[in-house]
Amino acid sequence: MRLDPQCFNEDCINRVFIWSGNADLLLAIIKSVEDAMNVAYDTERARVRVIIMVEDSPLYISSLLPLLYKEIVSQTQAVMEESLNEEPRFFRMRARPKILIASTYEKALELYRTFQPYLLGILSDVRFPRNGRLDPDAGYALLKLMKEETPDVPLLNFSSEESNRERASAIPAVFLNKNSPILHEEIRGFFQKHLGFGDFVFRLPDGHEVGRAANLRQLETILPDIPKESILYHARRNHFSGWLMARSVLPRALLSLPAISSAATAARPVRGAAIACRCWARRVGASPDA
């Protein structure tokens, strides 16, 4: 079944979802509404990260949104399980990345401009409305613009047409085929590898791996042995802050990481700021094994 977006008046209906038997959709709808209501306050006060999903198909929104929230919540719960009291548990849940949905080029651009300093990643379809008409190149144009302005933000381009893979690689952006039988697993892999939900992999500028940390404890342990070139490589690309933000680690020390990253000439300040993040997490009762 295909629903024509023009059949619905957005003044009366915020968004259309399609029930396919997945009970997680109901919770995802509630979380989506909460994120839209709280994102302005949470980004301003706590620098909470934002994921923008650009999709106009109710069917795919209804399929993908529960998966996205499930990945984020599972990461947050893995941290909260070791909390000492309810206060850090509540803080961690409030500090999880927010997911915002856009169904048109103009709305996606508006969200991007508004929350650009807090972006964790962008997931976009290829074909959706632009200037009031369905544009087969809207997703390509949007991601290309975002890559030019914020080159370090991970981009995911999904489409039902395999021919778009080459165009996505030219941006560059990760490409996933909507018709893939393992689409959900591939999206989970994107979260793990590109959005900071997996291990922090230390690499040299040439791509050679020199270390790996699964949690804050391991990050603190291996930092003294990581080559300066690797630390500066990641710091200048805001990889540390992105990885920590994905885990809802929002200490005051983290606020200094962007400034350190942009003009880093020595690895010691970056090491100190990153280690301070784990010390802060330990003080508030969060698990260093997150």
Language-model features: locations:
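A short, hydrophobic beta-strand element within the central beta-sheet of small alpha/beta folds
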Residues: M1-L3, N14-I18, E55, I122-S124, ...
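Short acidic, S/G/P-rich loop/turn micro-motifs used as interaction or catalytic elements
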Residues: A23, S57-I61, E106-K107, V126-G132, ...
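Conserved acidic segment of CheY-like receiver
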Residues: V48-L59, L64-R89, I99-I101
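Acidic, metal-coordinating helix/loop segments flanking the phosphotransfer/catalytic sites
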Residues: V79-G121, P129-N131
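Acidic catalytic/metal-coordinating carboxylates
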Residues: T104, G132-A141
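Terminal, compositionally biased segments used for targeting/anchoring and flexible tails
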Residues: E162-A290
